[in-house]
A protein has these predicted regions:
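Extracytosolic low-complexity repeat regions of secreted or lipid-anchored proteins
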Residues: 156-194
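N-terminal segment immediately downstream of the Sec signal-peptide cleavage site
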Residues: 18-84, 182-219
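Secretory targeting and sorting signals
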Residues: 1-19
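Intrinsic-disorder/low-complexity loop/linker signature
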Residues: 52, 92, 134, 162, ...
Length: 219
């Protein structure tokens, strides 16, 4: 998990992401009878690991996602579908970034690594198969302006061939999804203060509008 015209010109095509890694645990999803969930807001920060420069985003994180209630082999919620963020950097430059593919359906969300029943909190990761044509990376995060275009992607696939996993946590009570990722620069065009070797750390939260509840699946 976006409609970013500048990025689409660099990474053309819309392809459904695929996930095939076996989950560490299974989960059941419900959304209060809703068939889709929506992001209603949140915040995010993109930090240059070399310079410490931060790009702050707080004007809204949005997505619309279908819910497959009762699925137990990784929940395909597509939580990054139609995902974009409007941002402002330290110099007041307006930016928009998000994934460049427009479609990230069938992303396996919340492969579980832990569940805290008392807190209603699930920890796990988002797993995307990055081997499909025209999908060089998970979230090809894109920053664009009239002055420069940055395309960012995960620097490596640490957990399985052609896969990239983004750690995330979802808390039922606050309906908050928290995620983070390391990203590296792929296709810069003269961006002041940016080097081709720069890496970035992304962290953000998304508030889910519907009463989405994720629980361990019963055997």
């Amino acid at each position: 998990m976006t409609v970013v015209a500048a990025a689409a010109a660099v990474l053309s095509g819309t392809v459904a992401a695929r996930a095939s890694v076996e989950p560490a645990a299974s989960w059941t999803v419900s959304a209060g009878g809703a068939t889709a969930v929506h992001g209603t807001g949140g915040s995010a920060v993109l930090t240059n690991d070399r310079t410490g420069a931060r790009i702050t985003c707080s004007t809204g994180l949005t997505f619309a996602s279908r819910v497959a209630t009762g699925r137990t082999t990784g929940q395909r919620l597509g939580l990054l579908d139609d995902y974009y963020i409007d941002c402002t950097d330290a110099n007041g430059l307006a930016l928009r970034f998000g994934d460049a593919y427009q479609v990230l359906h069938n992303a396996d969300v919340l492969y579980g690594t832990g569940y805290d029943a008392s807190a209603g909190r699930v920890t796990g990761y988002l797993d995307i198969d990055t081997s499909a044509p025209q999908i060089p990376a998970l979230v090809a995060q894109t920053l664009s302006s009239n002055a420069c275009l940055l395309v960012l992607q995960p620097p490596a696939v640490p957990s399985a061939p052609n896969h990239y996993r983004v750690p995330m946590t979802y808390t039922n009570s606050s309906r908050t999804l928290t995620l983070g990722a390391r990203l590296s620069l792929v296709a810069p065009t003269s961006c002041p203060g940016v080097q081709i070797t720069d890496t970035y750390t992304y962290s953000g939260t998304v508030v889910i509008g519907e009463p989405l509840t994720i629980t361990p699946a019963t055997s």
